[in-house]
A protein has these predicted regions:
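Conserved alpha/beta-hydrolase
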Residues: 90-112
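Gly/Ser-rich "nucleophile elbow"/oxyanion-hole loop immediately N-terminal to the catalytic nucleophile
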Residues: 131-150
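Short alpha-helix in the alpha/beta-hydrolase fold that links the catalytic acid
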Residues: 226, 240-250
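An N-terminal hydrophobic leader/cap segment in hydrolases
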Residues: 2-54, 61-63
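Hydrolase active-site cap/lid region
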Residues: 158-210
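Alpha/beta-hydrolase active-site loop
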Residues: 116-137
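C-terminal catalytic histidine-bearing segment of alpha/beta-hydrolase fold enzymes
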Residues: 255-301
Length: 301
């Protein structure tokens, strides 16, 4: 009996250690060399306004594009993504009459933070960004809409629980923090990954809190009356369409103001390539669809 108990204790301790080591390595700080800005986007970069704001103990770096007007689009970037990864999408929003506020998340690129912490950190960072924007008078804009990609697509839906916004666009969004971590783990090691599920949940609850880790994008959408557009690539191999995506939980969202769009254009139906055309510019058709959704469905027009 003592041997069984000892073996169990050793298994628990070993599982906790392995979980923490792998998790912390996965969400290590992300930095990279600056990419050259395409000549067509140099005026966009030259005219943007740099801002900083606090998220917890860290100072985050962001940019405001535009000088005021009707609607500000606050963008939440994906995991291992920086502000400049979305310059073509930002330009499209500006050309369509919207302002944009976007930022580097904790532990990424130009923002402070020793690590990216986890999926839930995107929720906290976006909450801090929205609070900062609200206290700044939305930088001269009347309304705010949200656009998020990947981890950011999860965060913008969770923001519905705490902020009044005109509309939400989620692209390639994961449904929950646990699904965001478990899906790639299971893809690598199979069903055995679920043996560490309780330790992973407890570690994230310790890093954040149980309420935040338990947030589900589908639940937040279902409890809101805000228009939401969920976009997902048919062949997304990072957040699978019928796996941990928000789209996979569509049956839990019984709301007429929510639209679902599966993007199936070849070579543009993955996790990130759905945002771009073959020449590296924005996916013109998708961005036009998104802007039309904002024009036709947003609250407070």
């Amino acid at each position: 009996m003592i041997g069984i108990t000892l073996a169990f204790v050793l298994w628990v301790v070993g599982s906790v250690v392995v979980t923490v080591l792998i998790y912390d390595a996965t969400f290590a700080r992300y930095e990279r060399e600056e990419k050259p800005v395409p000549a067509a986007l140099e005026p966009l970069v030259a005219d943007r306004r740099a801002v900083t704001f606090s998220s917890g103990d860290n100072t985050l770096a962001g940019y405001v594009y535009g000088d005021g007007g009707d609607m500000l689009v606050v963008m939440a970037p994906g995991y291992h993504a920086c502000v400049d990864d979305y310059l073509w999408q930002i330009q499209h929003f500006l050309d369509s009459g919207y302002g944009v506020f976007v930022f580097d998340t904790t532990g990424s690129c130009h923002s402070e933070g020793e690590s990216a912490v986890g999926f839930s950190q995107a929720v906290w960072d976006l909450d801090s960004a929205l609070t900062f924007a609200e206290k700044s008078g939305l930088f001269g804009y009347r309304r705010v809409a949200l656009f998020g990609h990947s981890r950011g697509g999860y965060a913008v839906c969770c923001a519905l629980a705490a902020h009044e916004v005109a509309a939400v666009i989620s692209v390639a969004g994961v449904n929950s923090a646990m699904e965001g971590v478990m899906e790639p783990a299971a893809a690598r090691v199979g069903f055995v990954a679920y043996g560490n599920y309780p330790f992973l949940w407890l570690y994230q609850a310790w890093l954040f809190d149980a309420e935040t880790v338990s947030l589900s994008a589908a639940d937040c959408i279902a409890q809101s009356d805000t228009p939401v557009l969920i976009v997902h690539g048919k062949n997304d191999d990072a957040v699978e369409l019928d796996g941990g995506s928000i789209y996979a939980h569509r049956a839990e969202i019984d709301a007429p103001q929510v639209d679902f769009l599966v993007w199936d254009t070849p070579q543009q139906d993955g996790h990130s390539d759905l945002l771009f055309d073959a020449d590296g510019t924005e996916n013109e058709a998708l961005m036009t669809y998104i802007c039309q959704f904002l024009e036709q469905n947003s609250k407070g027009k």
